[in-house]
């Protein structure tokens, strides 16, 4: 009988800024926890061969990470997911097919590690993506759409990302979409000789907060338009120059939209926040940065408003990529090594329970025979403790070489066959040994840096 492998079959589907237009990414974007939960539940209901699943949705990518049941056909899972996406997002399967990138097994693991390490980002080295992945994993885990398999994968991905940051310095310049946007705004400020160094920011989410911090660092005064005054108060406590930032409810947008030359918009709204009906003619030119996906700013009809989207910033990012080529090469070497180490780690996790089961089986057998001997008075009761120690040392000595051999072979491809044979020979799958203590091996500290 063929032995079933216990190694997880990993699978990813990715739609990114490299393969899909901003217009199409807007349709795929999920900005609500309710919508995300419904989407994951749809996958769980209609894709029985998908064991675990999570979704990463950002301004530059929409990705599905999954582990599949043994024997599942990856192309069938891909087609099923594309069909669900097409129905859910009112898109055609053929359009999605043209843009999707599928990875399985080692290439899927390598892809997840690369994304988490910011090597696949529009701005290579930006650190925001790691936090976004942690949030995506946390949500899927807490809603019970993922457990052991994806926890193992993401646990290692976060370690890999930290290693890339620490060993390559790829993130030292602190470049991100928000910083690139502010840098471009600063160039515009100087070229246009704008008199007042002030900016309007709509939103108070993660992206908006990064924009605000970069603007304050460049000595701008910032007016924030948002919905949550309490959130603003908490945010202000983090700032070095809180006096340079003020807050108004977004309901007052009409009062301020025509007063600022520089505007940044980054909210999770699925609709346009800034609409043409709000606009009035001004004597000055205006430069607006829409950093949201879906976009928050309707394409302006006035000639003196210049609008930059996330994709418009790509040419400004190329210089950053070229400057970091050496760090990027080293980072990919780390990711490649981490992918190999991940599978070695996974295989060792499969071996450890077998070793513990063997030792527990030996202990139970020795204890059983000792109790028989005591009951039949083959040995005096006062010798019980010493005999237990002798038996413990004996089965430790007996299992020493098999333990070393198992750990050594855990990193080899034949590990599954060896582990399966031992389980079959010693009937370990049917033993009463409890594996609950091993659950800590799968714990993922997603909240740690």
From Swiss-Prot:
It catalyses: (S)-4-amino-5-oxopentanoate + tRNA(Glu) + NADP(+) = L-glutamyl-tRNA(Glu) + NADPH + H(+). Transmembrane segments: none annotated. The keyword Nucleus does not apply. One of its GO terms (biological process) is protoporphyrinogen IX biosynthetic process. GO terms for molecular function: glutamyl-tRNA reductase activity; NADP binding. The keyword Oxidoreductase applies. Substrate binds at residues 58-61, 121, 126-128, 132. Pathway: Porphyrin-containing compound metabolism; protoporphyrin-IX biosynthesis; 5-aminolevulinate from L-glutamyl-tRNA(Glu): step 1/2. It comes from the Bacteria. InterPro entries: 4pyrrol_synth_GluRdtase, 4pyrrol_synth_GluRdtase_dimer, 4pyrrol_synth_GluRdtase_N, GluRdtase_CS, GluRdtase_dimer_dom_sf, GluRdtase_N_sf, NAD(P)-bd_dom_sf, Shikm_DH/Glu-tRNA_Rdtase. NADP(+) binds at residues 203-208. It is an enzyme of class 1 (oxidoreductase). Keywords: NADP, Oxidoreductase, Porphyrin biosynthesis. The active site is at 59 (nucleophile). The record marks 111 as: Important for activity. Catalyzes the NADPH-dependent reduction of glutamyl-tRNA(Glu) to glutamate 1-semialdehyde (GSA). Belongs to the glutamyl-tRNA reductase family. Possesses an unusual extended V-shaped dimeric structure with each monomer consisting of three distinct domains arranged along a curved 'spinal' alpha-helix. The N-terminal catalytic domain specifically recognizes the glutamate moiety of the substrate. The second domain is the NADPH-binding domain, and the third C-terminal domain is responsible for dimerization. Homodimer. During catalysis, the active site Cys acts as a nucleophile attacking the alpha-carbonyl group of tRNA-bound glutamate with the formation of a thioester intermediate between enzyme and glutamate, and the concomitant release of tRNA(Glu). The thioester intermediate is finally reduced by direct hydride transfer from NADPH, to form the product GSA. This is Glutamyl-tRNA reductase. It comes from Helicobacter pylori (strain P12). The gene is hemA.
């Amino acid at each position: 009988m063929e032995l079933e492998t216990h190694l997880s079959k990993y699978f990813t589907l990715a739609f990114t800024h490299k393969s899909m237009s901003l217009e199409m990414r807007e349709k795929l974007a999920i900005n609500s926890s309710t919508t995300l939960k419904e989407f994951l539940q749809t996958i769980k209901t209609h894709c029985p061969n998908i064991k675990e699943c999570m979704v990463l949705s950002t301004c530059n990518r929409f990705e599905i990470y999954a582990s599949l049941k043994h024997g599942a056909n990856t192309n069938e899972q891909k087609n099923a997911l594309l069909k669900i996406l097409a129905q859910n997002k009112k898109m055609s399967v053929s359009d999605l097919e043209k843009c999707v990138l599928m990875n399985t097994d080692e290439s899927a693991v390598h892809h997840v590690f690369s994304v988490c390490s910011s090597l696949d980002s529009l701005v290579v080295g930006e650190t925001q993506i790691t936090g976004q992945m942690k949030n995506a994993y946390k949500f899927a885990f807490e809603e019970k759409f993922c457990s052991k398999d994806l926890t193992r994968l993401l646990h290692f991905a976060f370690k890999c990302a930290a290693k890339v940051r620490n060993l390559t310095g790829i993130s030292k310049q602190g470049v991100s979409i928000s910083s690139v946007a502010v840098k471009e705004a600063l160039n515009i400020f100087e070229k246009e000789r704008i008199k007042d160094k002030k900016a309007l920011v709509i939103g108070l989410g993660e992206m908006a907060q990064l924009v605000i911090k970069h603007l304050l660092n460049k000595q701008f005064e910032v007016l924030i338009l948002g919905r949550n005054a309490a959130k603003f108060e908490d945010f202000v406590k983090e700032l070095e120059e809180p006096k340079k930032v003020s807050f108004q409810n977004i309901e007052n947008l009409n009062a301020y939209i025509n007063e600022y030359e520089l505007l940044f918009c980054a909210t999770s709204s699925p609709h346009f926040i800034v609409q043409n009906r709000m606009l009035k003619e001004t004597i000055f030119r205006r430069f607006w940065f829409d950093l949201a996906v879906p976009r928050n700013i309707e394409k302006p009809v006035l000639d003196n408003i210049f609008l930059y989207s996330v994709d418009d910033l790509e040419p400004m990012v190329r210089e950053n990529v070229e400057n970091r080529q050496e760090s990027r090469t080293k980072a990919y070497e780390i990711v490649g090594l981490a992918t190999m180490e991940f599978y070695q780690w996974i295989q060792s996790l499969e071996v450890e329970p077998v070793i513990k089961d063997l030792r527990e089986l030996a202990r139970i057998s020795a204890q059983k025979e000792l109790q028989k001997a005591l009951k039949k008075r083959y040995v005096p009761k006062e010798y019980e403790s010493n005999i237990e120690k002798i038996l413990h040392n004996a089965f430790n000595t007996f299992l020493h070489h098999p333990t070393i051999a198992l750990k050594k072979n855990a990193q080899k491809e034949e590990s599954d066959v060896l582990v399966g044979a031992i389980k079959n020979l010693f009937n370990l799958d049917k033993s009463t040994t409890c594996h609950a203590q091993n659950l800590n091996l799968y714990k993922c500290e997603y909240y740690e840096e």
